[in-house]
Every structure is written in structure tokens, then in C-alpha cells.
From Swiss-Prot:
The gene is apeB. This is Probable M18 family aminopeptidase 2. PANTHER family: ASPARTYL AMINOPEPTIDASE (PTHR28570:SF3). GO terms for biological process: proteolysis. Its cofactor is Zn(2+). It comes from the Bacteria. Keywords: Aminopeptidase, Hydrolase, Metal-binding, Metalloprotease, Protease, Zinc. Gene3D superfamilies: Aminopeptidase i, Domain 2, Zn peptidases. Its EC number is 3.4.11.-. It comes from Clostridium novyi (strain NT). Belongs to the peptidase M18 family. GO terms for cellular component: cytoplasm.
Length: 433
């Protein structure tokens, strides 16, 4: 079994290679290819075999990987872990170039998801995403990933001398206060297509070949292991790449079992999941049904398989805050490095119930992993996640769990080194059943 610190450093490497959902899927694919998985295309007929390993992608930003069990799928079902590839950030708008004070070059952006806005101020920022190029088939243009891994932007604060009330709290305007500066106007500056030309240079293509883009900002600096005893992981995008990384390790390092082991990494969780690659789609259901059909089953066999299946929906949980303990529930107070937290809500914003929670608790016991429970304060409205959304498309028992975090949706979130290791252990135990 891997050393905890080594595994945490592997997480930091994984996150840094994955500045966007597109890059996360690309990083996952590289791991899967190395581990002997074969890629399936949606447009092709699937001929899968028991004991073999496969994956398919959607929109370059979501992925489903699976190891076909050696049992009968309608009798042994699927063991599924779900997570998501996206994180709160800023998306660059079309025609983004702006000038200010006849001096600065700025980019026009919009907020993606629910970031803690002030944590993005005064940070060196880079840009990454997907670029669409002219192709031979007008309906299927060529796409390329781009990552300008340089500190090329920053969102500067307003000096306290010009904003005396800043330490009493101030609301940031998303159209005014959070636009990054890219540089200074000089004699060579041409406003039109300024960013496209920089992207084209990075990709070594003619900028006129670029039709469109999906580009996002990210913190340039890599995450780190911190704490007097190296207890913590400090990084952006822990929500939810921490779960993706732990589940990926669990899938690739587990044995073939009777059931078919599945890892699904959805996109767009942070904006509601209502996309073709999100949890509120038939993406996962279609993949599972195609697995059954390829194994010579029919639709009734598919429904039988679902009744024998189980989903662990893994999305970050809230740890009790050291300075704001009153924000946590009085009796359910997850702590860092005390194990994954089962997420429970009377509103059904989480899928956990006594049955599915008992399954996860038994798994943790078998893996020798501590387990906690998270419930919101009764006077606080919490978030939701992929679990209840995907449950509307699949009739499968499900539990919502997550690694406890501090500063969720900050540009730098915090989790426990032990907890990331615990997550991997229980996921591997689940897949080995």
C-alpha cells in the first residue's frame, strides 16, 4: 500500500495536470491507457468481454471507465463510484479583450459555479481549456487542449487607502471587480484577436484556424503539503478532483470481481449538471445499458442489473471550521483526517438513507477506515451534488459521501493527507467485493 504522503503528492501532481475538466479527463485517460484500458467510441458498436477494461468520454470533459466483471451482469450488477471533473472558476467570454485607462489590457470573464471571489484576487493566474479548429467535417470540427502554464494574469485589489471599509467586508461586482489584467498596451498591441493569437502561438497553429474556445482561469501556483506534521493538502480543485484521483486509484489497483466496476466522472456539477455530460443526463444509464447489451443481455437484464447495483457518490464534505465552529451542526461535526463523511439531508439533497449508509459504514469497517457523518445545521441550506441528480436517471441504491474540506470553493481548499488515503482504501475495498 502506498505511503500517505506519497499518495498526497501524487494528488497534487494530478490536480496540477488538470487545470480544467478537459485536462482532467485527458489526465485520467493517460492513467487508464497505462493500466491497459481500451477506449470505446459512442458512435461504434461495442464488443466487450468479461474481465477486460474499457472507457469512453463525453464532450472531452466527462468519462466513464469500467472493468467488466467475470460474473453475470444481470445477477451481480454494477459497483459504481461517481465524482465530477469541474470546479468553480472564471470562464473567458467571446471577444474578451478590453482596454482600461489607455494602459491596461483586460479580459472579459464570467463566473463559473460558486467560487469564493475574493480568494482569486492578487493571485498569479494562468489560462487553459479547449480550442475548436476548422476540420474536414463541418459537423465534427477538430478540438485541441491548450494550457498556457505561465502566470500571465492577475486580478488586482484596490488599495486600502482608496477603500477604507474593505476590512469591514465588501461585495465584489462580477463584471467590474473580477476582470484580470493581461498586460500593458504597447506599440505592437492589436486589440482584435489578441488572446486568440496567444493561444495559436501556444498550439503552433494559424489563429485564423481557431473557430471558438472554452477557456478558463486557474491559479498558476501548484498545491502543497502543509502543517507542522505534514497533515494537510492545500490546493485548488480538491472539490472534486480529490475524489476523482482516489477513485481512479481504487479502480485501477483493484481486482476483477463478479460485478462490473464503474467509475463515472461527470462534468458541470458546479453549474447544475444539466448538460449532456452532466449527472442530469442519460450518459451513465446509456453506458450501463450498452454494457448489458454487449454481453448479450436485453433491457430486462439491464433493469435486473440495476437492482443488484450500488453507487457511491463522492463529492467533498464540509469539515468543522476552527474559527467558526458555530456554523456546523451541534452533534455531527466532521474533522480533518478522521475519515470520509456520509452526507445526510432530510430534504433528500443527498441520497444517503439508513440502508445505503449502513453499506458504506460496513465497507469502511472492512477497509479499517474511520467514518464520520455530515448534516447541515437545521437553519442552514446546504448544497446538493451528483448523487440525487443521477438517481433520477438510475434506479440504484446510492450513498453520498465526501472527504471533509475547509474553505470549499476557495481558490485554495484544504483537506487531510490521511483522508485522501482513507478514501482510496475504501474505494479499493468496494471494487474488490
Amino acid at each position: 500500500m502506498k505511503n500517505k504522503i506519497k499518495f498526497a503528492n501524487e494528488l497534487l501532481d494530478f490536480i496540477y495536470k488538470s487545470p480544467t475538466a478537459f485536462h482532467a479527463v485527458d489526465t485520467i485517460k493517460k492513467v487508464l491507457n497505462k493500466e491497459g484500458f481500451s477506449e470505446l467510441k459512442e458512435c461504434e458498436k461495442w464488443n466487450i468481454e468479461k474481465g477486460k477494461k474499457y472507457y469512453m468520454t463525453k464532450n472531452d470533459s466527462a468519462i466513464v471507465a469500467f472493468v467488466v466483471g467475470n460474473g453475470e451482469v444481470h445477477e451481480d450488477g454494477f459497483k459504481i463510484i461517481g465524482a465530477h471533473t469541474d470546479s468553480p472558476t472564471f470562464r473567458i467570454k467571446p471577444n474578451p479583450e478590453m482596454t482600461s485607462e489607455q494602459s491596461y489590457i483586460k479580459l472579459n470573464t464570467e463566473v463559473y459555479g460558486g467560487p469564493i471571489l475574493n480568494t482569486w484576487i492578487d493571485r498569479p493566474l494562468a489560462v487553459a481549456g479547449r480550442v475548436t479548429l476548422k476540420g474536414e467535417n463541418i459537423l465534427f470540427p477538430e478540438t485541441k487542449l491548450v494550457n498556457i502554464n505561465k502566470p500571465i494574469m492577475i486580478i488586482p485589489n484596490l488599495a486600502i487607502h482608496m477603500n477604507r471599509n474593505i476590512n469591514q467586508g465588501i461585495e465584489l461586482n462580477r463584471q467590474v471587480d473580477t476582470l484580470p489584467i493581461l498586460g500593458l498596451i504597447n506599440d505592437k498591441f492589436e486589440k482584435n484577436d489578441y488572446l486568440l493569437k496567444a493561444i495559436a502561438k501556444e498550439l503552433d497553429v494559424d489563429y485564423k484556424e481557431i473557430i471558438d474556445f472554452d477557456l478558463f482561469l486557474y491559479e498558476y501556483e501548484k498545491g502543497s503539503i502543509i502543517g507542522i506534521e505534514n497533515e494537510f493538502v492545500s490546493s485548488g480543485r480538491l472539490d472534486d478532483l480529490e475524489a476523482v484521483h482516489a477513485a481512479l486509484e481504487g479502480l485501477t489497483q483493484s481486482n476483477v470481481s463478479k460485478a462490473t466496476n464503474v467509475l463515472v466522472c461527470f462534468d458541470n456539477e458546479e453549474v447544475g449538471s444539466s448538460t449532456k455530460q452532466g449527472a442530469d443526463s442519460n450518459m451513465l444509464a446509456n453506458v450501463l445499458e450498452r454494457i448489458v447489451i454487449s454481453l448479450n443481455g436485453d433491457r430486462e437484464d439491464f433493469f435486473r442489473a440495476l437492482s443488484k447495483s450500488f453507487i457511491i457518490s463522492s463529492d467533498s464534505a464540509h469539515a468543522v471550521h476552527p474559527n467558526k465552529g458555530e456554523k456546523c451542526d451541534p452533534t455531527n461535526r466532521p474533522k480533518l483526517n478522521k475519515g470520509p463523511a456520509i452526507k445526510i439531508a432530510a430534504s433528500q439533497s443527498y441520497t444517503s438513507d439508513s440502508n445505503s449508509s449502513s453499506v458504506f459504514k460496513a465497507l469502511c469497517s472492512k477497509a479499517d477506515v474511520p467514518v464520520q457523518e455530515f448534516v447541515n445545521r437545521s437553519d442552514e441550506r446546504g448544497g446538493s451534488t451528483i448523487g440525487p441528480i443521477s438517481s433520477t436517471h438510475l434506479n440504484i441504491r446510492s450513498v453520498d459521501i465526501g472527504t471533509p474540506l475547509l474553505a470549499m470553493h476557495s481558490i485554495r481548499e484544504l483537506c487531510g493527507v490521511d483522508d485522501h488515503y482513507y478514501g482510496m482504501k475504501v474505494f479499493k475495498e468496494f471494487y474488490n467485493l
